[in-house]
């Protein structure tokens, strides 16, 4: 039973955990070797509540920011101070980390679909769709999904 436990979005946690581990090992070198990720203030993350915390990312570097946040949050929560040395922190990743993303973007290819499974709260853009400007009403279900 525990093997098939799901999150509020219907994703199987066992699969999510393994995706985080695999993607983490693949991307660790980017943030640890190729680009040296500068971390400051990881002690703040340890003192945050378990629910209702929202971090905002710059859209232009979105996927890199999301992956970096997964690395930093998991490293910090497993006792590392301002460091992602030794990728062992991914063995038991925090599974209730989510980020807000455009539904259209998260369906655009294999990598976005995998990242969506790992933790996207997908919403519909109200100002743009498929490269065209639009004017949509905000979907209240999108807003309520953020609070799940």
Residue ranges and their predicted role:
Residues 1-40, 68, 109-117:
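A transmembrane-helix-recognition feature enriched in membrane-embedded lipid enzymes
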């Amino acid at each position: 039973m525990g093997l098939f436990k799901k999150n509020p979005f219907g994703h199987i946690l066992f699969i999510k955990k393994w995706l985080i581990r695999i993607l983490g090992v693949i991307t660790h070198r980017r943030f640890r070797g190729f680009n040296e990720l500068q971390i400051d203030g990881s002690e703040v993350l340890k003192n945050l509540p378990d629910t209702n915390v929202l971090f905002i990312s710059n859209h232009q570097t979105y996927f890199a920011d999301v992956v970096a946040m997964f690395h930093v949050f998991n490293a910090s929560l497993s006792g590392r101070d301002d460091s992602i040395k030794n990728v062992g922190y991914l063995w038991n990743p925090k599974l209730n980390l989510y980020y807000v993303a455009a539904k259209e973007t998260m369906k655009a290819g294999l990598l976005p679909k995998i990242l969506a499974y790992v933790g996207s709260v997908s919403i519909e853009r109200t100002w743009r769709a498929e490269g065209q400007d639009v004017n949509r009403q905000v979907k209240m279900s999108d807003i309520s999904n953020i609070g799940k």
